[in-house]
Design a protein with these regions (language model features):
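Glycine-rich phosphate/diphosphate-binding loops and the adjacent beta-loop-alpha structural elements
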Residues: 45-58, 206
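A short, well-structured juxtamembrane/interface segment
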Residues: 31-47
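Conserved active-site and cofactor/substrate-binding residues in soluble primary-metabolism enzymes
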Residues: 11, 15, 19, 34, ...
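Glycine-rich phosphate-binding loops that contact phosphosugars or nucleotide phosphates
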Residues: 52-58, 62-176
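Short, glycine-rich nucleotide/cofactor-binding loops
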Residues: 25-32, 98-104
Length: 207
């Protein structure tokens, strides 16, 4: 049986956009800016002291991490994406930034714990402050979005092809995190007195 549509397709799209925008506004109003300042200070310190920054995430959170890494590179930071073949090993005083909605992806948490054991500072963006990731992080910025945690982590769901209907909640977290991290970039631009023209000079010429 075909389910009757309550809205036209374009109305679904409009409603989704409004819901996402409202979620971003709520997060901007409610986010813990003590943790935000801690993350910004970590990045400012890495920039001033020429320390390395590593970013990491799985799935769509990984794509958000890559976009953030690109902007950090534009600002002149020494940044790497975990998982790339050219990414070096983490060392003492490096900064690792992890993005995970659930905060319970096993592979992500294992790498985070390994980095901490090497003396790396760990910062995270997650929607679950009581998660494993949130607990082990030196700085944990909570971005509300995904509130339910599956018994399987991200990698396990991909292997068996299980796509539980967390997509809307996941989307809320990922988009809100992307907007939040762009806000962090704006703050770093102000701190470092970098303009958009300065960032353009660092933009890739081989694409």
């Amino acid at each position: 049986m075909t389910r009757a549509r309550l809205q036209k397709p374009e109305e679904y799209a409009r409603s989704a956009m409004k819901a996402i925008a409202a979620n971003v506004q709520t997060i901007a109003d409610e986010i813990d800016y003590v943790e935000v300042n801690s993350l910004i200070n970590d990045l400012e310190s890495a920039h001033q002291n020429k320390k390395r920054v590593f970013v990491m995430g799985a799935g769509r959170s990984g794509l958000v991490a890559r976009g953030f890494a690109m902007r950090l590179m534009h600002l002149g930071l020494n940044v790497y994406v975990v998982g790339e073949t050219v990414t070096p090993a983490v060392e003492t005083d490096d900064l690792l930034i992890v993005i995970s909605g659930s905060g319970e992806t096993k592979s992500i948490n294992e790498m985070g714990a390994l980095a901490k054991a090497k003396g790396t500072r760990l910062a995270s963006v997650t929607s679950n402050k009581d998660s494993t990731l949130g607990t082990i992080s030196d700085t944990a910025v909570i971005v509300k979005g995904r509130t339910k945690v599956s018994g399987m982590d991200f990698m396990e769901r991909q292997v068996i092809g299980s796509h539980i209907s967390f997509a809307p909640l996941g989307t809320m977290f990922e988009i809100s995190t992307m907007v939040f991290l762009d806000g962090v970039i704006a703050a770093l631009m102000e701190i470092t007195k970098k303009s958009e023209d300065d960032l353009k000079k660092k933009h890739a010429t081989l694409e």
